[in-house]
Regions:
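Nucleic-acid modification enzymes, centered on SAM-dependent nucleic-acid methyltransferases
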Residues: 1-171
C-alpha cells in the first residue's frame, strides 16, 4: 500500500483517491524468503506458537469447514513471516521482569493478532485490512492480506498503533 506524500501534507483529500497498491517486487519475495529462513533457524521461538490441533466444532467443521481449506493446527493460520514476527514479540515480552509491563505489551499483542493472520482479507469498504472477528467464524479469505505486524506510517492493527492506543488509555 502506498500514499501520495504531497496529498498527505495537505489533509484535504479523500484518502481512497490517492491510496494505491503496487505489485510484488523481487525484493518483497526475497524479504519473505529471508524471514522464512530466519523462522526455520530459530527453534527457540517455536515454543511461543501453539502446536495444538484446531478442535472440531460447530463453527469450524459444520458451518464453514476450515479443515477443507487446509487448516489443521492453530499455527496454520499464520505464514512464516507472521510466525517469526509474533513469536519474536512474545519472546522479548517474556524476558521482561515487570509484570505490569508484560501485561500491557501482551494486551497490545493480542489486539494485533486480530489483523495479522492469514485469515485476514481486505475490506474495500473500510479501505483497510479486515478483522479476524469480522464474522462469528473462521472463514478463510479467497485473497489473504498480510498486514505489517510492527507498524508503518499508515495502517491499522499493527503492534505500534495498538501500543500507542494503550498508552493513551493509561495516561
Amino acid at each position: 500500500e502506498y500514499h501520495c506524500a504531497t496529498c498527505d501534507s495537505q489533509h484535504n483529500y479523500n484518502k481512497s483517491e490517492v491510496k494505491g497498491y503496487r505489485s510484488v517486487k523481487k525484493e518483497d519475495v526475497d524479504l519473505f524468503k529471508k524471514a522464512k529462513r530466519q523462522w526455520e533457524s530459530s527453534p527457540e521461538l517455536h515454543e511461543y506458537v501453539p502446536s495444538e490441533d484446531i478442535p472440531e466444532g460447530h463453527m469450524t467443521s459444520v458451518r464453514n469447514p476450515i479443515f477443507d481449506h487446509g487448516y489443521e493446527k492453530w499455527a496454520d493460520m499464520f505464514n512464516k513471516r507472521q510466525l517469526l514476527s509474533l513469536s519474536s514479540l512474545l519472546y522479548e515480552i517474556d524476558k521482561l521482569d515487570n509484570q505490569n509491563s508484560k501485561e500491557f505489551l501482551l494486551l497490545a499483542l493480542t489486539d494485533c493478532l486480530r489483523r495479522n493472520t492469514m485469515m485476514i482479507g481486505y475490506s474495500q469498504v473500510a479501505n483497510q485490512v479486515s478483522d479476524l472477528f469480522r464474522t462469528n467464524a473462521f472463514d478463510p479469505p479467497t485473497r489473504p492480506t498480510e498486514s505489517n505486524v510492527w507498524g508503518a506510517e499508515y495502517g491499522t492493527g499493527t503492534f505500534k498503533s495498538t501500543w500507542e492506543m494503550i498508552i493513551r488509555g493509561v495516561e
